[in-house]
């Protein structure tokens, strides 16, 4: 199956923290339907105890990981200038756009679904 979704770190971190809507949404995915970026992988595996990092590693291993390329770097630079996004957000957007994927995030402040058709915000946390 060709991937459809690029998962932002917030989705996986919410799942690891036991946020129900994240887990529910992730369970709807079919095998191969979603991928993560090297940025997501690093962000998810950066924190926590060694036991928590082991769980995070196992979760990340369930998804193919997209590498950063010079094309995505160039697009990220353009997007950062145009939208004043933080660099990791610009890279996520660039990868999603370049790979024709929906960026799944809950970062509605950075990414507005109404403005950016490549964005999917499947739930919110209050």
PLM feature spans:
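Short, well-structured N-terminal submotif of metal-dependent ribonuclease cores
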Residues: 1-36, 45-58, 126
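Generic structural signal for small/hydrophobic residues in well-ordered secondary structure
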Residues: 8-9, 44, 76, 96, ...
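Short active-site oxyanion
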Residues: 32-34, 61-64, 97-102
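Acidic catalytic patch
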Residues: 42, 62-82
